[in-house]
Amino acid sequence: MKTNLLDFNLDQLTQHFAEMGEKPFRAKQVMRWMHQMAEDDFDAMTDLAKSLRAKLHERAEVRVPSLMTGQASSDGTRKWLLDVGTGNGVETVFIPEDDRGTLCVSSQVGCALECTFCSTGRQGFNRNLSTAEIIGQLWWANKAMGVTPKNERVVSNVVMMGMGEPLANFDNVVSAMQIMLDDHGYGLSRRRVTLSTSGLVPQMDRLREECPVALAVSLHAPNDAIRDVIVPINKKYPLSELMAACRRYLEKAPRDFITFEYVMLDGVNDRPEHARQLLELVRDVPCKFNLIPFNPFPNSGYDRSSNNAIRIFREILQEQGYVVTVRKTRGDDIDAACGQLAGQVQDKTRRQAKWTQIIEDRKS
């Protein structure tokens, strides 16, 4: 079986080329061709020796996930469903804005964490994505939008906020992010790559040491009682441990704050007393807040908070000097908004069946 070179960051690719008897600069050349030119044909890599190209044809390949479907939203958001084999597909979303273009990247086929308000979590879990399948989403987006080094960069920011919990696939996610950051890869700054986690505390500490990028934490609740229900990983890593991990992370983070993401669920976590509890929770953690209006999906069991409830919640936080943004819902007409990514998951956890039974019980 041929080796997929997209699975390697620069250090790994250099080692692979050394084992082939090639010099380190060859790895950098191939890295630039693969990632900066979105090239998957070795014959097109014209500054490589013919003998090396022949060797690569024999032993290696540049294999990205193939496109299953693509959709464009009325607001310019684009969503691609990419085939990762055995009946599974993952979704990646490009969100254009005036001053940036953000790509939302998936890290797993489904998700094992079972956050109750998230469509991805309802789909169950199949497996982790490989490095090639993760970085292949950025590769595919650049290819689809005709990007080369001569063009203005279209994807200026990457957020690891698609399907899956990134820190549950630590090694492959970090390797992919290293390619994003590498000057021979995509050359993004650490401030422009954001990883979002539900709060896997040991892996947060590893990330701080190995690849400290901007960090967002899917908080969604001001106390353990609520978070235990809607973000069940909280039972393993409660809020006191999570806040301590956030403080440690800031020692090496590229930004001097954590972004706390908070989905607004009507009657669940959106009352003024919840906002005041939230202020008490984060008092020792430099942070900003991103309030996310809930994006409904069939049989979710939740409703979106009213605009008035969101406004009051936001103002309570702002009065204490915090920066608070309310996420603009983008791509909801193509199910590309936050919490709506479901992909195509051959569930190994039987969670789809469990939720189907719960929904049927509600109806009866």
UniProtKB/Swiss-Prot annotation:
From the record, give the cysteines joined by S-S bonds: C104-C338
The subcellular location is: Cytoplasm
Q: List each copy of the Radical SAM core domain by range.
A: 97-333
The processes (GO biological process) annotated in the record are: rRNA base methylation; tRNA methylation
Co-factor: note: Binds 1 [4Fe-4S] cluster. The cluster is coordinated with 3 cysteines and an exchangeable S-adenosyl-L-methionine.
Function field: Specifically methylates position 2 of adenine 2503 in 23S rRNA and position 2 of adenine 37 in tRNAs. m2A2503 modification seems to play a crucial role in the proofreading step occurring at the peptidyl transferase center and thus would serve to optimize ribosomal fidelity.
Q: Belongs to which family?
A: Belongs to the radical SAM superfamily. RlmN family.
According to UniProt, the name of this protein is Dual-specificity RNA methyltransferase RlmN
Q: What is the lineage of its organism?
A: Bacteria, Pseudomonadati, Pseudomonadota, Betaproteobacteria, Neisseriales
